[in-house]
Amino acid sequence: MINITVPVFDNDYFVIVDSESKELAGVIFSYVGSKSKYVPLFEFPITTIDNTEYNEDNLDEHAISRRRSREFNIKVKNALHRAGGCKYLILGNLDKDQRSFLSFLDDYNLIEINNVSEVDSFLSPIVSKNKILNCREDELLNALYYAVSNDFILKIDNSSPKFVEVNFATEGLVVIEDVDRVSTVVAVNYALSVNSQIKVIPPLKVNHIDIRNFIKEWKDGDDNAYNDLSAELYNGIQDLDFNLYEYATFFTVGGPYSLILNNIIPITHVHLRFSPDFFVFNNIFFENAQNVNSALVFSPKEFSDEETNYVINKLEEGNFYVKDLVGDNATLYNIDHHVKQYPFDVLHFCSHGGEIDGHSIVEEFTDRNGVKHVIEYDEVLAFAIQKGEKTVGVHSKNIWRKFDGLIWGSREFKEKMIPNYIISDMINEMDRRIDKNRTYKKVIENSCMIKCWDSVYQAMFNIMAIHHCPIIFNNTCWSWSDIADSFLSVGVRGYLGTLWEINNGIAKKSAELFYDKIFSENVLQALQSSFLPTIGKRDENIYIYWGLPFTTLRPATSIAKSKKNVAEELLDSVWDWEDRLQQTKKKSTKEIMEALVEWGINEIETNFRKEAIEIISEMKDSQQG
């Protein structure tokens, strides 16, 4: 097993910094950071409005920002509770709009720092460091790592001499793409907490679509595409000798470094775009927390020979309670509700995956100022049919392509700085229209799905596993990106996916070897064992792991106890949703909550009646006692 100690939280400090205030986050961390402990550090996304009441029935230009900020408040408040509180709650460059969303500020000793020049006056009285290291902004991360390692505090001075990197002998390596976000400071924080060396490299010049296209062209027979991908990813790491380390973690915007490095050592990845602050925090917390010891196994039985039964048996050998969504139970309705509303620590997918068909749509609309625009996008639909339900759930995903002729997300698109209200007008208008100018397409690029018994699953959710952070093994084709994004954003401890279309025999053997080791070694080491069937084959290096190297799954005491854990979580969830219903005004939101409550009650009555009665009886006895 990889020898790595799980970090502990530093309960003295809890830091929340505006996501674009990288230098400020670095200077603050130089004061409060230390080796071998992890300071809870989070980046607050940009907010365009304060937390005021509004008409939720119509999407306005602030809807995305408002929802994102409210979700951040819930998640960071939970993290603060899980960390055990703090002596000092430090806010870095949060404006009044951002602060208005934080509902817990009055409960803690609050320190508000607006810029780098204020850091020393606020933090020097509460820390014992007094040695100073001057550095330039462009050398922040390397200097920060050295400063915290040697009890220096950091001062930004762009006239300083060039910082000379100092490498320490460590077992682990953390490679950080130097994007202009606070998340890179989170990466330094993590590296110090696990006593790993860092290597800062330039940001990638390619995005996940470019990377996927390189891989697709390579697998279609163009070896130059692999060379082009390698050239992009090797920039910055070509001088590293990975044989000096036992494992490496890449903080990246999507680079599959394990592929181009041929898994020379055990490698994990952390996505810098999908809440890396919560990803690291949750991995640390749930490694030592009491888990539910529950698993979901999903398979519509698409293959004559697959790993499904083997996986179920291995998880049950570890005394996990396994809920199998297999055969005609592997429906879109079932997987959608279980992912959102069922407590689990492991989810295994065995099915077909990848891109699917849909429609291309071109529509003209007029914004609130009377200006006409043309939007081009692709639409993918799926239908969740459940016997006994009065309505059919429609899962619609739009993939934006062009706006007024500009490629969505391109440099030209960003430079145009389209106002938020135009985007909200566009979305509202598209939602209202029933008849659209649709053209069928056999393959929708960048679409992603998992084949169900009756439809396809596109992983569209914002809650998961009743706030547990599970490990996902998506053993379908092309599962490393796009469909992985929802899981990484909402919160997992680990996500294992494939970089291209995998051979079913390889997928089966690899999964079986992985679960053979899952309770005796950590997840990363179990993954190394699963590589054996791929060596020398077309699928060599096909798997990529989004996770951290210390993550483990521990066996439970008994399946009966694990099943009771699930029942208890389901009961708590139903009661929680019922409480929220009383406070909710929006009709559509109430309908969603009512459906979740109804599903939870039905799940308890159908599969956990005995356990629920026992739990409620114990609660009554406890209250009477």
Residue ranges and their predicted role:
Residues 97-98, 354-359, 481:
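Short glycine-rich, flexible loops that bind phosphorylated cofactors or substrates
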Residues 74-81, 86, 117-151, 213-235, ...:
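Low-complexity, serine/threonine/proline-enriched polar segments
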Residues 106-116, 268-275, 366-401, 467-469, ...:
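Short acidic, glycine/proline-enriched helix-loop-strand junctions
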